[in-house]
Amino acid sequence: MPRGGATGAELQTHHTFSFANYYDPRRVHFGALRVLNDDTVAPGEGFGTHPHDNMEIVSIALEGALRHGDSMGNMKVLRPGEIQVMSAGTGITHSEMNASETEPVKFLQIWVLTDAQNHTPRYNQVELAPAKRNVPHVIVAPEGRGGEHVGWVHQDAWFYTLDLDKDRVVEYRMNTRGHGAYVFVIEGSVEAAGEELGPRDGMGITGADEFPIKGETDAKAVSYTHLTL
């Protein structure tokens, strides 16, 4: 199913779920997964200061450098191999700008519904540990369930990356029985639970506590698991 979004000289954005001017009643959320935006920002451009509240916001850098500034006083640059996690809670403002004047920045921004209203706002930037190929690699976990190189959110939600070799099959297991998973392919092609997915394709999977993911080519994917609402 085609994604929503917009294309211009400053920004190319693709929305998996309803966002901004894109609305599809069939694609509002998957469990607590509310937004999955795939953004490419031109050199020197970006998103000026804007507000958020009561949302867990995860940013994953794919290429280039993303400069972040917020009302809590954080000024950081996010690069590939790092993730950024914000709890908007009672309210924050922030900006996201391409830190380069010559190269575009590409990143995923993912919003997760919070487990409770009005948490204290916070910002965390994490350098990810090296990932083994053909093994799901946790990058975000619920509070207290991760580690030094894992971000955390106020929600029973998990994020993994998976670097998969061609023809390799990995059994993907839910963290908790009854959870669902959303698989989003960054590069290459996979077969997930019997369905073929190409670059930037995504699919929600429910009703199974585990399912196979096969590399149709060498591939890179990100997955999300949470109780399906």
Question: What residues fall within each predicted segment?
Answer:
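Short beta-strand His + acidic residue motifs that chelate non-heme Fe in jelly-roll/DSBH
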Residues: 68-69, 86, 93-101, 171-173, ...
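Glycine- and acidic-residue-biased ligand/ion/polar-headgroup-sensing regions
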Residues: 55-69, 82, 175-193
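Hydrophobic, well-structured mid-protein blocks that either form specific transmembrane helices
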Residues: 85-132
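Hydrophobic secondary-structure block in the mid-to-C-terminal portion of proteins
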Residues: 148-204
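A short glycine-rich, His/Asp/Glu-containing loop-to-beta-strand
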Residues: 5-51, 55-56, 105-107, 129-173
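Short acidic-glycine-tyrosine-enriched beta hairpin
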Residues: 72-85, 194-211
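Hydrophobic alpha-helical segments and helix pairs
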Residues: 57-97, 104
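Conserved small/polar residues in nucleotide/adenosyl-binding loops
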Residues: 225-229
